[in-house]
């Protein structure tokens, strides 16, 4: 796994600088070195229209000044910085600013570096579900969460035949929550989680067959005692247990 990540970093680094420009100033970066707990990163700022000498400032998120450099020729300013893995990815936002006799340039667009620094494939996707009695009939409520994965994960609810029924992109570390009316689906469903560097699927969860469902609907209309519902809910729970066992035995 560590090897795979290193390979990824190497590939991304080999792709060269990613560059963005606003208001006459560009910001770009390159990962120079990967250490177990930190990354050495080269950030370059370039304001090609500014007259020399140019004073470049590298700003972190919320406008905090990280470093300043005065450049006397037409080369971009380079900042060599160490980033520890402990920092929260969303705090690692940088921008450049430049001042010279010809004026002020920037701030540049904000650079977010988490992808190359923290890229991690999706792994150990868990799908948990409960049966609820909604207004429009019985509903399966499904919660999907991968134990790791960065950049952010898009979760999809996939139904019979691979059809995507819904998708969500929750905040980092939060589960996606789907609600699936039993009347609108047949066969099975599953969760799928994907980010820029990988994809993972939960085990398929079979839905109860039509006759069991018809009984359930009648039950929920209040014409029968609640027992069949409990049996159905019970069988769904046991399916969940089996599904999660299957998951943990195939998990990475
Ligand atoms: C960055 O971190 C590495 C390893 O932690 C260290 O060897 C290197 O000297 C540091 N560089 C700077 C510029 O602080
Ligand atoms: C799903 O539910 C959990 C727990 O209630 C919550 O923390 C999470 O933010 C929800 N996800 C979405 C995408 O709303």
Swiss-Prot record:
<dbReference type="Pfam" id="PF17736">
    <property type="entry name" value="Ig_C17orf99"/>
</dbReference>
<dbReference type="GO" id="GO:2000558">
    <property type="term" value="P:positive regulation of immunoglobulin production in mucosal tissue"/>
</dbReference>
<keyword id="KW-0732">Signal</keyword>
<feature type="glycosylation site" description="N-linked (GlcNAc...) asparagine">
    <location>
        <position position="177"/>
    </location>
</feature>
<dbReference type="GO" id="GO:0002250">
    <property type="term" value="P:adaptive immune response"/>
</dbReference>
<keyword id="KW-0391">Immunity</keyword>
<keyword id="KW-0202">Cytokine</keyword>
<dbReference type="InterPro" id="IPR040878">
    <property type="entry name" value="IL-40-like_Ig"/>
</dbReference>
<protein>
    <recommendedName>
        <fullName>Protein IL-40</fullName>
    </recommendedName>
</protein>
<keyword id="KW-1064">Adaptive immunity</keyword>
<dbReference type="InterPro" id="IPR036179">
    <property type="entry name" value="Ig-like_dom_sf"/>
</dbReference>
<dbReference type="GO" id="GO:0005615">
    <property type="term" value="C:extracellular space"/>
</dbReference>
<dbReference type="GO" id="GO:0005125">
    <property type="term" value="F:cytokine activity"/>
</dbReference>
<dbReference type="InterPro" id="IPR013783">
    <property type="entry name" value="Ig-like_fold"/>
</dbReference>
<keyword id="KW-0325">Glycoprotein</keyword>
<feature type="signal peptide">
    <location>
        <begin position="1"/>
        <end position="18"/>
    </location>
</feature>
<keyword id="KW-0964">Secreted</keyword>
<feature type="glycosylation site" description="N-linked (GlcNAc...) asparagine">
    <location>
        <position position="82"/>
    </location>
</feature>
<comment type="function">
    <text>Probable B cell-associated cytokine that plays a role in the regulation of humoral immune responses. Involved in lymphocyte B cell development and immunoglobulin/IgA production.</text>
</comment>
<dbReference type="GO" id="GO:0002313">
    <property type="term" value="P:mature B cell differentiation involved in immune response"/>
</dbReference>
């Amino acid at each position: 796994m560590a090897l795979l990540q290193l390979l990824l970093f190497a590939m991304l680094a080999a792709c060269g600088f990613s560059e963005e420009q606003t208001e006459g100033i560009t910001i770009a970066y390159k990962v120079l070195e990967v250490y177990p707990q930190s990354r050495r990163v080269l950030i370059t700022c370039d304001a090609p229209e500014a007259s020399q000498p140019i004073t470049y400032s590298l700003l972190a998120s919320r406008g905090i000044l990280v470093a300043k450099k005065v450049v006397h020729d037409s080369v971009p300013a380079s900042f060599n910085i160490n980033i520890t893995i402990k920092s929260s990815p969303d705090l690692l936002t940088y921008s450049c600013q430049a001042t010279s006799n010809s004026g002020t340039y920037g701030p540049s667009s904000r650079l977010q570096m988490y992808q190359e620094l923290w890229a991690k494939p999706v792994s150990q996707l868990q799908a948990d579900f409960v049966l609820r009695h909604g207004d429009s009939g019985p509903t399966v409520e499904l919660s999907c969460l991968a134990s790791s994965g960065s950049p952010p994960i898009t979760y999809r609810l996939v139904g019979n035949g691979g059809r995507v029924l819904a998708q969500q992109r929750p905040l980092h570390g939060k589960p996606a929550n789907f609600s699936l009316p039993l009347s609108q689906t047949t066969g099975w469903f599953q969760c799928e989680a994907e980010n820029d560097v990988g994809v993972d699927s939960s085990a398929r969860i079979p839905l109860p067959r039509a006759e069991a469902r018809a009984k359930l609907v009648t039950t929920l209309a209040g014409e029968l005692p609640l027992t069949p519902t409990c049996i159905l809910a019970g069988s769904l729970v046991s399916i969940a247990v089996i599904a999660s066992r299957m998951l943990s035995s195939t998990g990475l």
